[in-house]
Amino acid sequence: MCRDIKANARESVLTNQLLRSGTSIGANIHEAQYAQGKKDFISKLEIAQKECFETEYWLELLFETGYISETVYKPLQNQFGTIRRMLISSINTVKKNDK
């Protein structure tokens, strides 16, 4: 999607931010797999969660400014909502089991 927007010479600042935050989610989840302990694991998942919130923001901004259509926006919004809920659930489970 970012490549399509840029190819049409429509926007670059927002799509760069979207690409950065969106890829950071996966990078932090991957990094959490190699955490040095539970605190580090939780920290990486919390960073991924924050990046997910940021990605949702950039998507909303691209939609509200007309750079992406509703047919592009809605499925992505749903996917990132699902990812966010999974991260929240995982964080809460680890914290609960750590007590």
Model-found features: residue ranges?
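Short, C-terminally biased terminal segments at protein or domain edges
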Residues: 1-99
